[in-house]
């Protein structure tokens, strides 16, 4: 995430809606202020999402997507 990133701004309301519907926490990390976070997970672009379960990264996704694709992605890991 970065404040200047158009696709990041575009998916923000989608992610907020998903967080409410699924009762999950979605945290944003500003890559301008935390540049090492990109390399830690091997990302080359934003928006980049990492799915954690019990403190471990279990999957990741890069790029803006429509809500059904995020729901499908999360559905692999939760009901």
Predicted feature locations:
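Conserved redox-active cysteine motifs that mediate thiol-disulfide chemistry
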Residues: 1-14
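Pocket-edge positions in alpha/beta enzyme catalytic cores
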Residues: 3, 29, 61-62
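Short hydrophobic/aromatic-rich motifs at helix boundaries and adjacent loops
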Residues: 5-8, 42, 46
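Short alpha-helical
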Residues: 6, 33-36, 68
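Thiol-based oxidoreductase modules, predominantly thioredoxin-like and allied folds used
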Residues: 11-36, 43, 52
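Pre-signature/interface helix of ABC/ABC-like ATPase nucleotide-binding domains
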Residues: 36-39, 59
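Non-catalytic, surface beta->alpha helical segment in thiol-disulfide oxidoreductase systems
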Residues: 44-79
């Amino acid at each position: 995430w970065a404040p200047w990133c158009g696709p990041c701004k575009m998916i923000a309301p989608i992610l907020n809606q998903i967080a409410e519907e699924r009762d999950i926490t979605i945290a944003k990390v500003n890559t301008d202020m935390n540049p090492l976070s990109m390399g830690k997970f091997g990302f080359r672009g934003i928006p980049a999402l990492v799915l954690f379960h019990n403190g471990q990264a279990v999957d990741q996704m890069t790029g803006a997507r429509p809500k059904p694709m995020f729901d499908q992605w999360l559905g692999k890991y939760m009901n």
